[in-house]
Amino acid sequence: MFSVVFLCLVIFSLWYFRKRLFVGKIVPSLAIRLLLIVLIFLPYQKIYRTFSANENGRIAEGTPLLTKLYNVYDLDWRGLTENARLQSLSFVWFKQLTSKTINKPKEYSKASIDKIYHKYSQLATTLNKNRKEHISDRTVIYVLSESLADPSRISGVKMSRDVIPTINQLKQHYTSGLMKSDGYGGGTANMEFQTLIGLPMYNLNTTVSVLYSDVFPKLNYIPSISNYYKKKNRYAVHLASANNYSRKTVYSKLDFNKFIALDGTPDKAKFLKPASSSYSDQSTYDNVLEYLDPKESQFFSVMTMQNHSPWYADPGDLDVSKEGFSVNENYNLVNYSKLLELTDQDTKAFLERLSKIDKPISVVFYGDHLPGLYPEMAFKAVSYTHLRAHET
């Protein structure tokens, strides 16, 4: 605030004393003035071309400073505010200015969109004909379970027991399946965006890196599922900084009533039980239950943190390993697996408590991506693009 006031005073002073300070023309020649303007903007034109030539969101290799500043260290997850502070405001501006969100499809027109709209409107009318309940009549809890993916699906992994028996049992009785994640070992916010808003990342330009910073600010209308709920009944819970991935800005624009986090928001988490390198899933669930009101239909967007890397746990009698893995890789694997077992137990307790509440409640539970502990050889493919590396 002080800097804004100071800047205004400087501008006013320059305007007020302009005739005394600037007597006559500093550069009398029009040609020289035009040349100076061109020289000022010439470097920016080169920078603009450099940013425009990015591939898959990465600056072309060999560009001094920029490749080290952006490609080597991934800072997008820290949000626009931190990016501007660490990489400069102009860096963020140029990146946003040159990021093309989506390529215009062939035969794109209002008429073609109207045709699609009417087709699916009629289909929706048919599907909803005999449905008596509206989604806003119940409470919906989206649980993004950090890095949750069954290790037994990785070929060659040996486990002394099933570490997620409750989750696997629930999958047999309720709607379930495998989800394709866009990321491997990361990309949480992108999966969060897609589940909330329903816009698949594969329809967007490959230069898009983080949906919350590259796409979200450009949306004139945000078709979030939370729109079906009153603003006062929208909650986000994440036991990390609210500023990560610009979540504070995102959930504010989505008109969420409260964002329960560690910092960056007035609504601080009340329950914090340490686990591994972060906080337990039990802590996350307890904070959800703290705000759950049976008298209201609420929407919760919940992101856990327990299973985020690095992974620390006491495996006890649990034995998990894969032949060909290094000692450190197997160490991470068994610790991660033990944390999954804790997730399974805490999720079971959470669902049991929800079942005792006199209110229709639906829980959408999913893992955002595989943990980044597996080497490429684990997928029997040449790279991490193998489908098995992206199924949770």
For each predicted feature, which ranges?
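N-terminal secretory/membrane-targeting segments
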Residues: M1-D137, K158-L178, V215-L219, P223, ...
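Solvent-exposed soluble domains appended to multi-pass membrane proteins
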Residues: T125-I135, L144-S145, D150-E391
